[in-house]
Structures are given as structure tokens and as C-alpha cells.
Amino acid sequence: AEITRGHVDVGPRLIDGKFVLLARDDSANPPVWRSTDDAVLRVVDASRIDVPNDDAYSFLGDMRGRKAYVIPQTQDQKIVWLGWNTQAPEIVKNFPRGAELVFTGHEGPGEAHMFIENGFEAPMSLYDSTKSEQQPVHMEANTHVHANWVFSEPGAQTISMEVRGTDAKGVKHSYPTKLRFVIGDKGSAQDARSMGASASATIADSPTATASSDSTAASSDASHGSSSHGAIIAIIAGVVIVAIVVAALIGRSRSRAMRDEVWQDG
């Protein structure tokens, strides 16, 4: 599936007892949890905005003062809205300490970044494709988070990651996969799919992975009902060694105010 707009969350699931990372596609009716090898996110030309030439965004390097393709932290109806959550009922039940998204690499033209903004505090970089080391982001239990995703160049791209978690019995689980993007209006979704199949290729968009069943109860009540209002209040929970601990609550009133304070449409 190629997804060009609407709400998408990646999140850990237990499918037939297997710990995996899937993408919940709310643009489908009913919503469905898709394999990350099938879901290709197109970041359209309408997402291009001016990157602030401000020291607060020094982690964006030469991208400052230039136009870039941005999936915003707060929803823009013209653009796909990518986040993550740990709200699947079986994850809430079996992984009380949440899970980690560990970013391990980027393939494709230019640079890719992800960062989060929290009101008047300085933006915090969560992922920088120019760094070679693993970059872990902790996902608190039963939370739903959105961040800013920034791409410098158009074209097919992937971001490799591994989801890791320790269940209530102390058993460690991990699952490597890739998020697949086509940046810009041109380019083929198939190009992104052909950039190396990941372990998630074995997980199909089957009835066991659909989001229209009881598996959506927690996430629907806590967050997705407010997606149309496009408001986010992000809470930074702390930093432990190199892991960034992030929690977020979905609000219902502020639309694009947080984004417009620093990101001006080009």
C-alpha cells in the first residue's frame, strides 16, 4: 500500500505469538495493521517548507535555511502523519516497561532526521542519518507519540530500525525492519519496496493484523479519535545514556500552532 496522507503509527504487536513491528494505517477503512515492507509512505511536494536558520536546529546541519520535506509533529491534512504507539492491548498487557525503537541506518539520497518539539523548550534530535551509531528511542508503555521527520532530498529511501522489548516474564524480544518512503511527488513506491526486504516481509496484512478488531480498543480511545484535531503535547521523560525516553499525550484543541511557531510554510 502507498500512503500519501492520513494517520499512520508504527508499533510493536504480538501476532501469533511473534513480536513484530507493524504500521497501523488509519487511511484505510477500516484501519489495518500493515507489514512495514508493504506500507510505503509518500511525502508529497506539498510538505516542503523552509527549515529555520536557527542555532536551535544546529543538529540539522546544512539543511538550515533551505527547503526540506517535512512530516510535521502536528497533523497537516495534506501530508501523511507518522508516529508510533505502544497501545495495542497485548503490548500494554505483556510489556509493562514499553519498548525501544533502535534506529540503525538510512538508505537513499540526502539526509533524514527526526526530532521532537515541546512547547518553548529547545527541540530534541531523536534520529540523525549522518551518525553511524545505533540511536535508540524509548517508547513508554501505553503511549502515542508524533515527531517531526525531515528529509533533505527527494527519492526512494528507507530507515532501518529494530524494535526491542522485555516482557513481563523478563524475556527479551527483538524484531528488525525498515520504514519505506518515497520523498516527493515523483518516484515509484516499488523502488522503496525493492530496497532490501526486511524480516517483516513474512508478516502479511492478514485478518490477525487488522485494526478493526478488539486490538484497536486502547489506541482508539486514547489517541486516534483526536487525530482529526491534529494537536500534540509532547512530554520528554528523560535521557538515559544514549537512549531518549519520550512520552506524549494527544490533545484536542491546538491544531498547527506549535509547528507554526518555528516552521513557516514556503
Where in this protein do the model-derived segments appear?
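C-terminal membrane-anchoring or membrane-association module
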Residues: 234-266
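Soluble mature domains adjacent to a membrane tether on cell-surface and organelle-surface proteins
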Residues: 2-206
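Extracellular Ser/Thr-rich, low-complexity/disordered mucin-like segments
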Residues: 205-239, 249
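Compositionally biased, low-complexity repeat tracts
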Residues: 2, 13, 221, 226, ...
